[in-house]
Design a protein with these regions (language model features):
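Generic detector of multi-pass transmembrane helix bundles and their immediately adjacent loops
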Residues: 76-302, 306, 311
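Hydrophobic alpha-helical transmembrane segments corresponding to the first two to three helices
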Residues: 2-115
Length: 314
């Protein structure tokens, strides 16, 4: 490479150093928020996202250091290239897997997954890892494959997000039907979080797809005039990606919510038959001491009238 190219790559290196600093600061905040300030509200998803932030910071740091070695003749080039490829592959795998988890509502509207969903996520994780690993080995040949993989992850994320929104809407409708207003508000908050995630994930993936597509065009038809376009494209793409991903992380961070926010939604939501049945004038139930009890009391007249509920003194 010419000296002019190396000077421009040095500018890209400064951009990567800046992004690495941003992810390091964000990761420090995430560490305190997850393990200190809101430890009771954190989940496995928040811990996985912290690992992703560490990998993103390392990837940008190693990339910046690699560009400073231009024209890439030093002995450290091989080790820096290996570090960049490894951190890039792991960070992409963890990043897109976490986005799929959020799209399924894990860590936001529920804290469990079905066996079928776990199998789907493991398959997506393996395919993502293998795809980006191959892309690092032959980026000029396998670029279209990586671009297709990214488009597939984009479609899966939007599909799962819409599906999760629909399930939460059905849950809210069921609460309204059975007149349980205490659970409507926290469930509606979950819907808002997933809904905002939908409108943040969409531009995030579009920016990634546009950035990778532009890089593919420049790599295949490279000339002197296109080098400046590569520089500006990397600058704009990197900044937009950092802003959108940071907004997604800020949206789903661990925080204090409603006391009912930890309740998972059920796919087959069935309420007690006693809610629909006619109760007698008295109903008794022996309850062990210090056992938590949830009681929903209807009107004292009408269909459910004459209900008397007693509690043990202990």
């Amino acid at each position: 490479m010419s000296a002019g190219h190396c000077d421009r790559l040095l500018d890209i290196a400064y951009l990567n150093f800046g992004l690495s600093t941003f992810w390091t600061i964000f990761g420090g905040y995430w560490l305190l928020n997850t393990w200190w300030w809101h430890q009771r509200n954190s989940s496995a998803l928040h811990k996985a996202l912290f690992a992703m932030l560490v990998l993103r910071a390392l990837c940008d740091l190693f990339t910046g250091l690699l560009f400073t070695t231009c024209p890439f003749t030093g002995g450290s080039v091989m080790y820096l290239t290996l570090a960049v490829n490894t951190s890039f592959t792991l960070s992409c795998t963890l990043q897109y897997t976490c986005l799929l988890l959020i799209a399924k509502g894990f860590g936001v509207s529920r804290h469990t997954l079905e066996r079928r969903e776990i199998s789907e996520l493991v398959t997506a994780l393996v395919v993502t890892y293998l795809g980006f690993s191959a892309y690092n080995l032959q980026p000029t040949v396998l670029g279209p494959m990586a671009l297709g993989l990214l488009c597939g992850l984009f479609c899966l994320t939007l599909f799962y997000t819409v599906k999760t929104l629909r399930k939460i809407e059905l849950q809210i409708a069921s609460y309204r039907q059975h007149d349980i207003p205490q659970l409507i508000v926290p469930t509606a908050l979950k819907w808002q979080v997933v809904h905002k995630f939908y409108y943040l994930a969409m531009p995030f993936f579009l920016v990634k797809i546009a950035h990778m597509s532009a890089s593919e065009v420049i790599v295949k038809w490279f000339n002197e005039a296109m080098f400046d376009w590569y520089l500006w494209g990397d600058l704009v793409g990197g900044v937009l990606e950092a802003v959108l991903l940071g907004a997604i992380l800020a949206l789903i961070r661990a925080r204090e919510l409603s006391p009912y926010s930890s309740l998972d939604y059920s796919h087959d939501l069935v309420f007690s038959p006693m809610v629909k049945g006619l109760l007698g004038s008295k109903a008794s139930k022996r309850i062990p001491p210090k056992t938590p009890v949830v009681v929903v009391i209807g009107p004292l007249t009408g269909l459910y009238g004459g209900v008397e509920i007693g509690f043990p003194e202990q």
